[in-house]
């Protein structure tokens, strides 16, 4: 298998020039949440693991989602530090957590630096496990810094048989699977029941879906919602994934960037929604976007995949956050006022994969973590029952889909049934290593167009400038005719 070179590995992160790549990397950031400040110290591909298991398991991620899954569901956990910086396993192994936020490529930048320095680091300072997202998965799995989950770590086809195929395909190169995940991330449209009743006369998911089953109908509902004083969407980015996940080809072929026609449909729709007041001009993750999901919000709905329901939307719906003593129950904010339907197009959003780092001296522990947290049917089912996350086991999800399971947050709806149907429609064939950077640059470039600060041609030019600065190896940009 042809791996990404060290130079191009750095370039794919979008933050270094050729000169910087050749100079490698400097020190780490003091903002890192890490129990150990020592950084690995030289470039490396795979190194032979030590015969004996290490006493420290270093795990890198960008938020506390996997940390919570690990601490709550990995059977070998014995003790968790009060500040959660470390977890102690029953065999005495210390798990050290390094958490660097995702914004502006921060997580990837620091991870890349550490991986390039992996080979000469002390054993207890080497990265053992790191997490990756769908938008940049290929950058890592098509490199020498990641272990094959079967050949190197020891998982079998039988172990992985219950998982959704797309979750294996996206982290596979030339037949080598180089990551595994506990979750599948099909997307749905989450809407406010109370607003749907006022605008459409019903809050029933099946009936609401008939009004939202294609983009023309969706736009009609946006007009009806506006007439009632509501926004259809919160901001510029909300519908983006439904368009970007349905493109006809990857972003990049060779060194040429091709802007898919479907992305320009998103531009046209978002410009129309902004001009007509169908959105609140928010951006993904900003305070307005979060507020629009809460008790004072007047937004019809949000495009969310599986993790978004339980990890983001639920929290934003509460008047009193759980951190302030609030409970996840009807009566706290608008808990119970959301429901979900398929929406106008199938899509996915995100997903987190566990990778074993080349050079780790904890292969048996990595194997056990992967087995328990991504392959164990009972654990997968329990995670879903407890958290409403959609886990990566087809049999377990089908059982819940066909059961009397109900989500109190979604007004008694069994949303797992809809996710189970949507999961089979996920197509990751056009995913590529530049996706995160190009998607972010595209969205950012057109915000000035949506708000009327620049014309469309200027937004296109700004996109081209941004990506050539971020990825100097990309030479051309082709727009739809």
Residue ranges: model-predicted function:
Residues 3-5, 10-138, 157, 381, ...:
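Conserved N-terminal structural module of periplasmic/extracytoplasmic solute-binding proteins
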Residues 40-48, 119, 132-188, 325-340:
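Hinge/lid segment of periplasmic solute-binding proteins
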Residues 67, 71-76, 265-368:
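Extracytoplasmic/periplasmic substrate-binding proteins
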Residues 69, 193, 370-400:
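Periplasmic-binding protein-like
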Residues 84-103, 122, 203-208, 271-285, ...:
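A local structural motif
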Residues 100-113, 213-217, 281-293:
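Short helix-initiation/N-cap motifs at beta->coil->alpha
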Residues 152-159, 168-239, 251-284, 358-364, ...:
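Helix-loop-helix "hinge/cap" segment bordering the ligand-binding cleft or interdomain interface
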Residues 332-336, 384-444, 448, 476-481:
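Long, aromatic- and glycine/proline-rich binding clefts that accommodate carbohydrate-like moieties
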